[in-house]
């Protein structure tokens, strides 16, 4: 991995993971209970898949299996594609997302807003 890419990963890393842990106190059938919830909505694109995409891309750069200018292609039904769209754009990659044509327009538009090309696939196409 080049020094420039290492610095890019270092700059964006604080926006992924390190999400707060919320402790909720409640009573169930008369007994005190505690519930812990990770606030993954604090991630870059608001979901846990940011961690997955970040780790995959960082490891791919470290191993040399992805280079600047390579295209990222992901098959997804939503959140992973959103994460790859955002991180791919940040790292300077073209991103193509294949997803089912019955997914919400909001997901499609969000990925496109990050610069991804979204290609819809019908049930028949698989």
Summary of predicted features, one role per range:
Residues 1-126:
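PLP-dependent amino-acid enzyme catalytic core
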């Amino acid at each position: 991995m080049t020094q420039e890419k290492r610095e890019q990963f270092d700059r964006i890393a604080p926006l992924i993971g390190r999400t707060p842990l919320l402790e909720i106190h409640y009573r169930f059938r008369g007994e005190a209970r505690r519930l812990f919830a990770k606030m993954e909505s604090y991630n870059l694109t608001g979901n846990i898949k940011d961690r997955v995409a970040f780790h995959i891309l960082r490891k791919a750069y470290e191993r040399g299996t992805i280079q600047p200018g390579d295209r990222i292609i992901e098959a997804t039904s939503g959140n992973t594609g959103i994460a790859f769209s955002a991180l791919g754009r940040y790292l300077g990659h073209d991103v193509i997302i294949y997803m089912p044509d019955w997914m919400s327009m909001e997901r499609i538009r969000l990925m496109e807003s990050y610069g991804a090309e979204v290609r819809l696939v019908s049930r028949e196409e698989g």
